[in-house]
Amino acid sequence: MNDRQPPATYTIGLVQMAMSPDPDQNLRTAVAKVGEAAAAGARLVCLPELFRSQYFAQREDAALFDLAEPVPGPSTEALGRAAKQAGVVVIAPVFERRAPGLYHNSAAVIDADGSLVGLYRKMHVPDDPAYYEKFYFAPGDLGFRVFDTRVGRIGTLVCWDQWYPEGARLTALQGAHILLYPTAIGWHPVEKATHGAAQLDAWQTIQRSHAIANGVYVAAVNRVGHERPNATADGIEFWGSSFLADPFGAVVAQAPADRDAVVVHEVNLARIEEARRGWPFLRDRRIDAYAGLSKRFLDEAPSAISNQPSAKTRNSDR
């Protein structure tokens, strides 16, 4: 645990980048972008999901497991040196090789002294056309976590986790003042004309809602560029648009949709107190009535009824 008093304000850097086919080049670019963000004043820098490679989960190919690395490993060591040199906290998403045949989509948290604070393993793993992640990644088994760093207590989740309010809530309830979502998301080119705007809006809206519901900052950090797994495939056009939302859900900084960018913006912890005083959602939660959330689906009426507060409980709240 970091014993220093966290700052009341600091600057965050969101690194949006296109990935080349060369993992070593991508790592060099990431290190340079960390330095660029730090030079612009950032004290916390987040990289995109699986930044070391192009998005390989567009196809199922066992040879691509060779892209994985241990933690600690080459990526965390290089970024640890960069973090220490620049004095910044770094979120480093990696394809983690945990053991032979066991892999995770993970995010390492590196403190400003270069030390590895901890690791988050992606909890929600998709299996959709061109997002065949279940072939590669075991679901996370570390739970939703927070990390004490030089900039205070932060939480990181990964990409598909951003669609689930439960993960955001459980992370915020542990005291995180910011939720970071390193991401790899984009359009199927054939759908862009008809659904593209709605898909991008939904992606931003769900994460803004996490900021509002929990009274925290939310940062989504995406890759950019059109990646094809082979010469004939349509591939994915990653939509960039990395952004920071404040505790009121306002988008206060955003990257373009079509190019690399390092976006920096102030995080002010006083805004959290301001938001939660005006919108006391944490105060008004009915934790006695949410048992049904631990079930896959409430198929039977008696099960649903059993999760309602009793008359005695209701009377005690008056």
Features from the language model and the residues they span:
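Residue-level detector of high-confidence beta-strand sites
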Residues: 106, 119-122, 241, 254, ...
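Short, glycine-anchored, charge-dense loop/turn motifs used at functional sites
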Residues: 12, 109-117, 243-252
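CN hydrolase (nitrilase-like) catalytic-core segments centered on the catalytic cysteine
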Residues: 68-91, 159-262
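Active-site-proximal beta-strand elements of phosphoester/diester hydrolases
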Residues: 9-21, 106, 119-122, 146, ...
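A short, polar/charged loop-to-alpha-helix boundary motif
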Residues: 122-136, 259-276
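Cys-nucleophile CN-hydrolase/nitrilase-fold catalytic domain and related Cys-dependent amidase chemistry
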Residues: 23, 32-113, 117-119, 185-209, ...
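Short, basic, low-complexity termini and linkers enriched in Ser/Thr/Gly/Pro
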Residues: 1-4, 301-318
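Cysteine/selenocysteine-centered motifs that mediate thiol-based redox chemistry or coordinate metal-sulfur cofactors
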Residues: 144-177, 183, 272-303
